[in-house]
């Protein structure tokens, strides 16, 4: 029988000093016999996805106490990728994931907490906390802040839905008036919550459902809706229940590594492919699997992407549907149920809330359930009022979206495409693979051949696009932006948004060893591995080289003879200490970022740390 970790600091005469300090935090005598549950909150006023989380940790804490536990809350940092986008701030986004994981590990381990509730929401916070939870392997429940309502603007009597990307594209489009651009800007992000499309934050919160570590509805229930409050209350009760099952009944099935096993990672990736999730999820799932000691690799992602159809299409892949529409159609449980009917997921994986995922689907699938509470839960609708307050409205859709032929979520026979929403491409320019969000690629450019335009920083590429130096048929190459070369593996939302604003969204491609925002659409290929800074062939591409992209056949090819590439590689190596470094790039790299670069690995491995690179 495992011993409560907390008793290291709460039991025994030699721990009198520690108990004195615990008492100073408000603990009473009988509290020393209870499990201590850490609450990792990520409230910050910098991020709309987190601005409403301030009191939610204490909401969970009171529920933990009522269930018989002791709750202790702490905070992590949270970077807003949208605000950090397009300048040097983006260098810090991906590194913050590891910092968050470490912070959670430090707090939980230093204070010997028995279990953990993770209150996350946005891009790097959910992955960072997920990595920490799998590293610690103590009972955990995830509950996120929830999606933002979609923006809405009335143009000439017609209502249009908006999101953050619309504001970026409109601002760079010379055909959009200042008044129109300002109207879009003011309407694009109307409430608290993670950005309203299937961007990275919402993708990751959906994946925690598929992994079995969060409650049904976690990925899709709006931040503003009263129905989301119950998820926080349930999380408080549930964490005490599973904590006691582990420590008092020796039930290891509730531990995160027992739940997030290889099959669960396959389920999560199948969901990701089916809903056309952010390409960043590939990076984060690989990193999470590494922490869980699960042998889940790019080869598995490639295999799954070839066999799972795209049955849900959401912004930025379409302007018609946002997360509020996914919820109305049954949320993550509905997507997984359609995959289950197609025999494409494992129903026998455990979850924190149900013995198996299959049993959870039987209850929460709106197409088959007789539970009226479940049906009402998925009718939770946007309130249409600008607010930063959680649970502030209780609007309901008049009905559910159960149209599996032409609705937001479809069955396999009526899929948006029988090919999945994400794909791994291989070729001489990316021997270890690269990633494209096929759900956002127009059918007309699934096969594309173009000439390379070389940029060794995102800033230079943006300047060229805005100066109309990029033409139809060009493939914009942005290199030395990988985990080590950036460092920090910047997102490329501005270049792709500006290509769209210039009318080149279906006429150009972009290839980078950096990554893309979940808000990116178009023929945008990221994570090229090995990256240029590690000697990857993307560092050998020259201006006007021809590159052939074939998504249906999962290939990307630099049309340069092997002997020419070998000559270029030799010339690069001859540069000595300047080899595999950008030419004439002016960029300040802080000590913190240099430390990150020294330990980081390839995107093909999730950009996880490998301390052996600096150990002597």
From Swiss-Prot:
Keyword Metal-binding among UniProt keywords: yes
GO cellular component terms attached to this protein's record: cytosol
UniProt: Mg(2+) binding residues: 81, 123-124, 491
Biological pathway: Amino-acid biosynthesis; L-isoleucine biosynthesis; L-isoleucine from 2-oxobutanoate: step 3/4; Amino-acid biosynthesis; L-valine biosynthesis; L-valine from pyruvate: step 3/4
Modified residues (N6-carboxylysine): 124
Keyword presence, Iron: yes
Summary of subunit composition and partner proteins: Homodimer.
Protein name: Dihydroxy-acid dehydratase
Organism: Methylobacillus flagellatus (strain ATCC 51484 / DSM 6875 / VKM B-1610 / KT)
């Amino acid at each position: 029988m495992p011993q409560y970790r907390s008793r290291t600091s709460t039991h025994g005469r030699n721990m009198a000093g520690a108990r004195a300090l615990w008492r100073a935090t408000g603990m009473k005598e009988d509290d020393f016999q209870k499990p201590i549950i850490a609450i990792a909150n990520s409230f910050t006023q910098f991020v709309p996805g987190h601005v409403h989380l301030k009191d939610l940790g204490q909401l969970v804490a009171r529920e933990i106490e009522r269930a018989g536990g002791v709750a202790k809350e702490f905070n992590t940092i949270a970077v807003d990728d949208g605000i950090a986008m397009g300048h040097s701030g983006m260098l810090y986004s991906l590194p913050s994931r590891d910092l968050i994981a470490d912070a959670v590990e430090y707090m939980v381990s230093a204070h010997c907490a028995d279990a953990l509730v993770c209150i996350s929401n946005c891009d790097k916070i959910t992955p960072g906390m997920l990595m920490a939870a799998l590293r610690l392997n103590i009972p955990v429940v995830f509950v996120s802040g929830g999606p933002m309502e979609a923006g809405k603007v009335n143009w000439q009597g017609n209502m249009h839905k908006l999101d953050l990307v619309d504001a970026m594209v409109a601002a760079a489009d010379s055909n959009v008036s200042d008044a129109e651009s300002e109207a879009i800007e003011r309407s694009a992000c109307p409430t608290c919550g993670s950005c309203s499309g299937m961007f990275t934050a919402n993708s990751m919160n959906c994946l925690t459902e598929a992994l079995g570590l969060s409650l049904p509805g976690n990925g899709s229930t709006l931040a503003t809706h009263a129905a989301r409050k119950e998820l926080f209350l349930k999380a408080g009760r549930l964490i005490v229940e599973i904590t006691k099952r582990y420590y008092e009944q020796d039930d290891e099935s509730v531990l995160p590594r027992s739940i997030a096993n290889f099959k669960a990672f396959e389920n999560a990736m199948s969901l990701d492919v089916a809903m056309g999730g952010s390409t960043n999820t590939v990076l984060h799932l690989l990193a999470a699997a590494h922490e869980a000691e699960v042998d889940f690799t790019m080869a598995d992602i490639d295999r799954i992407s070839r066999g799972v159809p795209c049955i849900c299409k959401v912004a930025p892949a379409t302007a018609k549907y946002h997360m509020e529409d996914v919820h109305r159609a049954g949320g993550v449980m509905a997507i997984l149920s359609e995959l289950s009917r197609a025999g494409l997921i494992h129903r026998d994986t455990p979850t924190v809330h149900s013995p198996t995922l299959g049993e959870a689907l039987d209850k929460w699938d709106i197409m088959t359930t007789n539970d009226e509470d479940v049906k009402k839960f998925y009718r939770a609708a946007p309130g249409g009022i600008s607010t930063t307050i959680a649970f502030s409205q209780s609007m309901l859709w008049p009905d559910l979206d159960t149209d599996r032929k032409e609705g937001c979520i479809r069955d396999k026979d009526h899929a948006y495409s029988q090919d999945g929403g994400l794909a791994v491409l291989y070729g001489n320019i990316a021997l270890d693979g690269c990633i494209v969000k096929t759900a956002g690629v127009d059918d007309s450019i699934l096969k594309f051949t173009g000439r390379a335009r070389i940029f060794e920083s995102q800033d230079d590429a943006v300047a060229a696009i805005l100066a109309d130096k990029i033409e139809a048929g060009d493939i914009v190459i942005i290199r030395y932006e990988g985990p080590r070369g950036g460092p920090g593996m910047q997102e490329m939302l501005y270049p792709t948004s500006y290509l769209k604003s210039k009318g080149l969204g279906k006429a150009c491609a972009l290839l980078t060893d950096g990554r893309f925002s979940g808000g990116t659409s178009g023929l945008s290929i990221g994570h090229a591995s090995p990256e240029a800074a590690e000697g990857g062939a993307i560092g050998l591409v020259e201006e006007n080289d021809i590159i052939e992209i074939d998504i249906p056949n999962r290939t990307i090819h630099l049309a340069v003879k092997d002997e020419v590439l070998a000559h270029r590689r030799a010339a690069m190596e001859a540069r000595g200490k300047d080899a595999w470094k950008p030419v004439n790039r002016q960029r300040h790299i802080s000590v913190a970022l240099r430390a990150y670069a020294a330990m980081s690995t390839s995107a093909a491995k999730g950009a996880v740390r490998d301390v052996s690179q600096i150990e002597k």
